[in-house]
Amino acid sequence: MSFQEVWEKEPMKKPRIQKITVNFGVGEAGDRLTIGAKVIEELTGQSPVRTLAKQTNPAYGIRKKLPIGLKVTLRGKNAEEFLKNAFTAFKACGKVLYASSFDQVGNFSFGVPEHIDFPGQKYDPSVGIYGMDVCVTFDKAGYRVKSRKLKRSHIPKKHLVTKDEAIEYIQTKFDTEVVRE
């Protein structure tokens, strides 16, 4: 029985996107970080959170707790729309998604080297080019029991998202090819 048949028969077993985390590692504070915040806000429609340096690195001029990156967490419809655009940009630069990018519970990550590959984006010399990491986290209906405050419980192994389920979901929903090695 294929995953599609199981998901139609038992909708609670169908995986869904819990969240998408978009990370801009700018590497420096100042104007480049401010411009990057505008770029990420334009791409996602949400204002980013600044990420801080964890340690001092004098070779790069970075001090501890200095803002050097940006991140945004997307959920729901915004997450699905952004992922469609991110896959378009990912394919535009000639990259493919490998099965090794998926972990054992179905989460996966990929990088988009240039933000100008997104639909509707054009190169602006005053902005430059920014790359980003996109991390996708999956869950199924009923996962709330492991994170709620009262009567917290564990998720049984048979209800966890598997690597193969996540690959099947991405291939059918987003029409993206996943290369198995």
Curated annotation (Swiss-Prot):
GO molecular function: rRNA binding; structural constituent of ribosome; tRNA binding
Alphabetically ordered keywords of this record: Ribonucleoprotein, Ribosomal protein, RNA-binding, rRNA-binding, tRNA-binding
GO biological process, one term: translation
Gene Ontology cellular component terms for the protein in this record: ribonucleoprotein complex; ribosome
Record PROSITE patterns: RIBOSOMAL_L5
InterPro entries: Ribosomal_uL5, Ribosomal_uL5_arc, Ribosomal_uL5_C, Ribosomal_uL5_CS, Ribosomal_uL5_dom_sf, Ribosomal_uL5_N
SUPFAM superfamilies membership: RL5-like
Disulfide bonds: none
Subunit organization: Part of the 50S ribosomal subunit; contacts the 5S rRNA and probably tRNA. Forms a bridge to the 30S subunit in the 70S ribosome.
Cited NCBIfam families: PRK04219.1
Function of the molecule: This is one of the proteins that bind and probably mediate the attachment of the 5S RNA into the large ribosomal subunit, where it forms part of the central protuberance. In the 70S ribosome it contacts protein S13 of the 30S subunit (bridge B1b), connecting the 2 subunits; this bridge is implicated in subunit movement. May contact the P site tRNA; the 5S rRNA and some of its associated proteins might help stabilize positioning of ribosome-bound tRNAs.
Family that this chain belongs to: Belongs to the universal ribosomal protein uL5 family.
Name listed for the protein in its UniProt record: Large ribosomal subunit protein uL5
Organism the protein comes from: Methanococcus maripaludis (strain C5 / ATCC BAA-1333)
High-level lineage: Archaea, Methanobacteriati, Methanobacteriota, Methanomada group, Methanococci
Primary gene name: rpl5
